[in-house]
Amino acid sequence: MKYYIPTKVYQEIDAVKVHAEELAGYGSYALIVTGKYSARANGALADVEAALDAYGKKHVQYDGIEENPSVETVMKATEFGKRNGVDFVIAIGGGSPMDAAKAIAIMLANPEKDAEYLYESAAHTKALPVVTIPTTCGTGSEVTGVAVLTVHAKRTKA
């Protein structure tokens, strides 16, 4: 078995501002995925929006990610992203927004698939670009290709 997960990690003060050009280079319209409050309260959302605005990139926020994100939430966010025509995804927050963003990126790149694709398929090879802006430490979601989601229909996580 072989894995290739191209990941860049920047750990520095004002990393979003310092790397704004790279952040803006992933597409023309970003879906910013967050929880309800913290990304706005801690200033991370404002930093990301300013970086995208500086390079003329459009962006829209989906702030409905709950703790232990569900497949249902991912599908709602996917529909929101489709309606807006986004072409890359940015997650701001802890493991929940980051995991949700990865799943949303998979579903946006595979519009013909339904929710079961997220937990019935062994591997996903197609996704929109994802940028993660972690605001907590400990989950490691920013450096993996894995997303943990709650599957209410099966009363489990996948």
State the predicted function of each range.
Residues 7, 109-158:
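A glycine/threonine-rich phosphate-anchoring loop and its flanking beta-alpha core
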Residues 86-104, 135-141:
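Glycine/serine-rich anion-binding loops at beta->alpha junctions
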Residues 47-48, 76-78, 97-110, 143-144:
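Short Gly/Thr/Asp-enriched flexible loops that form oxyanion-binding sites at enzyme active sites
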